[in-house]
Amino acid sequence: MNGFSKLMLGTVQFGMRYGVANTTGKPSFEAAKSILKAAYDGGVTALDTAPEYGDSEELIGRALSELGLSERFKIVTKIPKLPAGCDAEKFIAESLEASLRRLRINRADAALLHAEVDFPYLDVLKSMVGRGLIEVAGVSLNTASHRDDGDVADCLQVPASLLDRRFDRCFGKGRHVFVRGAYMQGMLLMPEGKIFIPEVVERRRKLEKLGIPMAELALRFLFSKPGPKSILTGVETVDQLKENVRIAALPPLDENDLRKVEETAFPELPEMCVSPSFWSQYKKLHNIQ
């Protein structure tokens, strides 16, 4: 797998309102188009999308076509959770073909099983390489219970951040890793009073003592991970995109700062604290509205 930029643009925001820190909502078509142009100009030529991200795929296809950049980006899409009892090969092939039509491309650079429970169908997805629909196949992981499943995948998407270390063992194994959740859906960057998880507040206070802006620290830490990787960030504005590009041009953390960051990860926080998928459970458990 070659050609994936170190910074990757997440596009769920193009299709729906997303993220606990999102204050601007879904961008307009013209705004999203401007973000894509700014991404290309800034060397961010990898995109992450999925059929379940509203009209994200359609928007990308139209915008890149109008910009004349359809062949300039590496695009990763996903296969929705397979319905029980379906013909897996037929479902996966039809899903990919529909995504390619929406994206206005002939082949996706990578496709991931969106639901980790569908991992047994990875070989079926891999067979789509032979059909010319995708270049490589992988899986998007979400929970620690499935982290060992990815060892046979050509590529992985995993959540990771300054506080989420569940998938550290997935790095440095030669395959490409797409990393999402760098800012924990924006929670790491929110005003302290708006963070509803005290454990996150406590850890962030320790990280702030390093004297490095939190957004910068979050990305530079992930760029310090071993092996080939792309750090996925979603934005709602061109200015946010340009700031991420600026940070991506900075060097990884030095050994001293990296050691201090590592120290904040122990003891490891419960999955309920670091994974957005479990935040509704956290709120219910702690009676948070």
Role assignments for model-derived ranges:
Residues L113-F266, Q281-Q289:
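Beta/alpha (TIM)-barrel catalytic core signal, keyed to glycine-rich beta->alpha loops juxtaposed to Asp/Glu
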Residues M1-E71:
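N-terminal binding-site loop/beta-alpha segment at the start of enzyme catalytic domains
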Residues F4-M8, T45-A46, E52, R72-K78, ...:
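Structural preference for beta-strand elements that scaffold enzyme active sites
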Residues A50-E58, L82-D87, A115-P120, S161-D168:
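Acidic-and-aromatic substrate-binding clefts and catalytic sites of carbohydrate-active enzymes
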Residues T24-A38, G85-R104, L141-D148, A218:
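Short, acidic/polar
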Residues L100-P120:
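Active-site groove signature of glycoside hydrolases
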Residues L9, A39, L47, I60, ...:
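Conserved, mostly hydrophobic/aromatic
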Residues G3, G61-K74, L100-R104, V129, ...:
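Acidic (Asp/Glu)-rich catalytic clusters
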